[in-house]
Regions:
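Gly/Pro/Ser/Thr-rich low-complexity, intrinsically disordered segments predominantly at protein N-termini
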Residues: 1-192
């Protein structure tokens, strides 16, 4: 839900953090939906799989719910998971302690939740692509799909039996979607 009062990006960034994190678009605070169990498990699994990859390929780093701000777009979004290459990492300890990173990630990953409106996801996707994010993944836990978006190309939809890659950002990363979505079934009662 958006608040009625408009403000600047600087005013928004000066506010104390909220739980779940708030986002900022069109001069308004936008409450990010509280993640479901499915969303939380998928975000944790994605972060772990990228961390394992980065231990073998020291190309970048993964963050969970890190706010990325764009002054040009006057927006601040909190991807569920974000990836950046090391050459784009904040260079000072104080920059790393600040609440928002004033750059877009190299990969933005959003995990759709039941409370997400399609227009909200479409707005975030358009922002990421306009702001120059080379790869955006939208993960749908209900459909068990991952849709990959890159600027200037049609989206690619991967199903649970497919393997997604992270090109053009990470050329060697491969994600068998069964490995990702299997966390949703662990411990379930049969037939539930």
């Amino acid at each position: 839900m958006a608040t009625a009062t408009t403000m600047t990006l600087d005013e928004f960034l000066a506010l104390p953090e909220t739980e779940p994190p708030s986002e900022f678009a069109c001069g308004r605070i936008v409450e990010k939906p509280m993640p479901t169990w499915f969303n939380s498990r998928l975000a944790a699994r994605l972060a772990a799989l990228f961390e394992i990859y980065f231990m073998a390929h020291d190309e970048g780093y993964v963050n969970v719910e890190l706010r990325h701000a764009s002054r040009e777009e006057r927006r601040a979004y909190v991807p569920d998971v974000s990836i950046a290459r090391w050459e784009r990492a904040p260079r000072t300890a104080s920059q790393r302690r600040e609440g928002a990173i004033e750059q877009t990630p190299d990969i933005a990953i959003e995990i759709a939740s039941p409370d997400d409106r399609p227009a909200r996801i479409a707005d975030k996707l358009a922002f990421y692509l306009r702001a120059g994010v080379p790869l955006v993944w939208i993960v749908d836990p209900d459909e068990r799909t991952l849709t990959a978006y890159t600027p200037g190309r049609p989206p690619t939809v991967f199903g649970e039996a497919d393997t997604a890659d992270a090109a053009p950002v990470l050329s060697a990363f491969r994600l068998p979607l069964h490995d990702l979505f299997s966390v949703l079934d662990r411990g379930l009662e049969p037939g539930s």
